[in-house]
Amino acid sequence: MLDLRLLRENPEATQARLDRRHSSYDIQPLLSLDQQVRQWEQERTQLQARSNEIGRSVGQKMREGADPQSEEIAALREEGNQLKQQIADLEQQERQVRSELDTYLLTLPNLPDETVPLGSSEDENREIHRWGDDRIREGEFAPHWEIGERLGLFDFERSTRIAQSRFVTLLGAGAALERALIAFMLDRQTAAGYTEVAPPYLINSASLTASGQLPKFSEESFRCDRDDLWLTPTAEVPLTSLYRDEILSADQLPLRYCAYTPCFRREAGSYGRDTRGLIRLHQFNKVELYQFVHPDHSEAAHQQLLANAEAILQALELPYRTIELCTGDLGFSAQKTYDIEVWLPSAGRYREISSCSNCGDFQARRANIRFKEAGQKGTRFVHTLNGSGLAVGRTMAAVLENYQQPDGSVRVPEALQPYLRQTVIGQP
């Protein structure tokens, strides 16, 4: 959530930064609502002051022996009653407009960091670096879904019977490979200083609002209407709310967490895209990285989180590239984002496998997560950062494609062999 005071005091500069996203966000309706609320607050304060003055005057006159039935006392009491009604009416109007103001504020995205490259689409994202170019092989490569079905690792047809399209059932070595990847990722991140968390998979609307999924992305998530619970679209959501409505001490920061969860998404806007394989499913597994940090250390934490995600691909010896998203491609809650894209040889291109974002104080304002410096007055909002470390299904797809052998088998990456207890999956 944006700082209302910033919007109020620097409307032109704030609008200009929003416009860098190349989206039609307009802060003027919000400023009009804010002005109306503040005007009513001022009127209510004046009416309350007059009401208090009347109360004191009546009390004083009664102590001086005035007749309670006198016209003067009756007139003062009548004015006091009218003022109370006016105040009540103003409070009701103010509550309604303040609710509209808060709702509008929740629809505005984060402001891009000044260092983010200007651009309107993913075509203007900037490549930062590549790793593993020497491991990219030439030739014809089978796509991962053909490899998996041939080796009996997963079954899409029966999954459609069980659920619907865009679901998968993992079998045998396929299920074992996914379990190995999850354990490997969690072990690597806990060794890097993250605390493992196993959060609820069902989350309430307040948690989705705090992280920025609601109200904008309500159509992207699966909801249990009877209980106001949603299937989590990412562990970022419950991790954001770990400290919702809490005040931390500065010496607690940074707080770094990793969590494995299944993730559930409707993928409503992706009709016809990636209809085969593990790239775009309604249910998929992911290991998420999350940090609560001091604002002064936010950028350094972002670089650290990115390195932690990249380290998984390096350990698996999977070629990848890292790009910085331009302003027009930023996610709703992010002020700066790096995407990591892994090489898929069957397609001859890189595909996103992780998105590492610095959200500044945007999510912390929505979740009301603050911290206090020792010996200082007041509190400040923490900064939050999140990233995939990594998307498990896409990592499996990359392993199957990059490690496929001429005889039809798949060599197990050396880093996974202690987890999978085999060096090769499948035989010709």
Curated annotation (Swiss-Prot):
What span is annotated as the signal peptide, if there is one? Answer: none
The EC category is ligase
A GO CC term attached to the entry: cytoplasm
Q: Which Pfam families match?
A: Seryl_tRNA_N, tRNA-synt_2b
- Protein's pathway: Aminoacyl-tRNA biosynthesis; selenocysteinyl-tRNA(Sec) biosynthesis; L-seryl-tRNA(Sec) from L-serine and tRNA(Sec): step 1/1
Q: What's noted about domains in the record?
A: Consists of two distinct domains, a catalytic core and a N-terminal extension that is involved in tRNA binding.
Name assigned to this protein: Serine--tRNA ligase
Organism whose genome encodes this protein: Synechococcus elongatus (strain ATCC 33912 / PCC 7942 / FACHB-805) (Anacystis nidulans R2)
What is the organism lineage in this UniProt record? Bacteria, Bacillati, Cyanobacteriota, Cyanophyceae, Synechococcales
